[in-house]
Every structure is written in structure tokens, then in C-alpha cells.
Amino acid sequence: MEIGVDIVEIARIRAVYERSGKAFMNKVLTAAEIEQCLAKPDPAVSLAGRFAAKEAISKALGSGIGHKLGWHSIEVLNNEAGKPEVTLHAPHLSYRVSISISHDRHSAVAMALVQPL
């Protein structure tokens, strides 16, 4: 069992989102994640939460985003109750992932717990 934590400034993510728009979202999020973020009153807050979640998961896996794990290898979607759930789209990763995401006006934070299946 491993854990990972990440925190990001919402203003930083908002600036990147406003500067590059969908290009940044397409790089970091899956189509389903983009749909959920854009459905929110302030998509930048949801985007920051997803970004922090993916970073926290990559830290828990010990790989980081890049060489072995891409942004689209991790999908974080809210279920009907609003709870974030993780799907790993990488055949070499057999893990159960639990994630918690929170934010205030300034920051989004995520904590991931990964367990081998």
C-alpha cells in the first residue's frame, strides 16, 4: 500500500486554462473528465482538483507522469453521488486506487491510496 499527496494553486491552473483553453484540458484530461469539468460553474476549480489527483496517484505509484504513466492513463470521474473514482488505463498497472479531492478558494489538494490487486 502506498500513498501520494499533491496540492496546486487554483490561480495557477486557471491561468494556464485561460491561456491555452482546451489544449491544456485535452493534454491532461480524458473526454469524460473534460465533460464533467465543463459542467461545473467554475471549470478551473474542478480542473485543478483533477490535476492534483493525477499527480497524487502518480506519486503513490512511484512513477510520476511521463515515462511509464501518461495523463490519460489515469481517469478520475465523479460517480452519481459525487465521489471521485479512479480508473487506470494502463495494462501494466494492477492497482486499486482510492482518491480524496478537496479545495478552498486558493488551493486544490488530493490524496491517493494505491493497493496492488
From Swiss-Prot:
Keywords: Cytoplasm, Fatty acid biosynthesis, Fatty acid metabolism, Lipid biosynthesis, Lipid metabolism, Magnesium, Metal-binding, Transferase
Cofactor annotation: Mg(2+)
Location(s), subcellular: Cytoplasm
GO-annotated cellular components: cytoplasm
Gene Ontology molecular-function annotations: holo-[acyl-carrier-protein] synthase activity; magnesium ion binding
One BP annotation, GO: fatty acid biosynthetic process
Annotated positions binding Mg(2+): 6, 55
Primary localization: cytoplasm
Catalytic activity: apo-[ACP] + CoA = holo-[ACP] + adenosine 3',5'-bisphosphate + H(+)
InterPro entries xref list: 4-PPantetheinyl_Trfase_dom, 4-PPantetheinyl_Trfase_dom_sf, ACPS, Ppantetheine-prot_Trfase_dom
SUPFAM superfamilies: 4'-phosphopantetheinyl transferase
EC number: 2.7.8.7
Gene3D superfamilies: 4'-phosphopantetheinyl transferase domain
Keyword Protein biosynthesis: no
Coiled-coil spans in chain: none
Alphabetical list of Pfam families matching this protein: ACPS (PF01648)
Family to which the UniProt record says this protein belongs: Belongs to the P-Pant transferase superfamily. AcpS family.
Function: Transfers the 4'-phosphopantetheine moiety from coenzyme A to a Ser of acyl-carrier-protein.
HAMAP family, per database record: AcpS
Protein name: Holo-[acyl-carrier-protein] synthase
Taxonomic source organism: Chlorobaculum parvum (strain DSM 263 / NCIMB 8327) (Chlorobium vibrioforme subsp. thiosulfatophilum)
High-level lineage: Bacteria, Pseudomonadati, Chlorobiota, Chlorobiia, Chlorobiales
